Amino acid sequence: MLLLGSLRRTLSKIESLARGISWADAVRITAAKPNGCAETNLSVRMLNRQVTIRPGTSDLRCIDKVFVEQEYWVPFETTPRLIVDAGANIGLATLYFASKFPGAEIIAIEPEPSNYDLLVRNCSGLTNVTPWRAAVWNTNIPLKIANPDAEKFAFSVTPEPNATSAIEALTIPQILDKSGYSTIDILKLDIEGAERELFSNGCEEWLPRVRMIIMELHDRYTTACSRTVYSKLCQFPFRQEVRGENVFILFDSEQ
């Protein structure tokens, strides 16, 4: 009975993964012994291209989140010109947005070196995607990875004035200035608790220049994260939808 139960769970996992990647890859990646180091390529159905992930890491969970559960499916009608993917990880959400909104320019921002390397490779050949190695913050201050031993999708940053190899901090106004756009149509935030810092100071300056926010809130990592964010959001009229771990905020066009 134990063997039968294990087989059923394995088949269920394969069937679920095959909604987002090829059947062959779903079988192979489920049967593989994870080592956390080697890379493998998966054929993603909706992209008609392969992506590189690291078996044994959180990358496969991200494949499930983005391409199986489609947690970044946008519930509001929009034709974005500029999408900013802050906390882009290895580029899976970036690729999802590029597929759904081929006319949009996408800036993908990721601070952690190994994730950034895969982000660049996974998005290679896409002329509308520009990767930046940086972190989003509320001011210009040197940053470092606060938890280098964390899972690949859970790296967070913290100020470190004396860091020898600091990560560049970018504010939202700086991103807009560098992009050449006056507004961000979709701002995706998956920044592992840094959303509290981002909204705690100066966000009143840039929130009127953002049309939609897609974010994952991280109260499990950062105290009063949601309270800080919503205390600022509530100064502006908006509609909200929730899909999986993501909150979708659509601002009133007249704000």
Predicted region positions:
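Phosphate/nucleotide-binding beta-alpha loop and adjacent structural elements of enzyme active sites
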Residues: 1-255
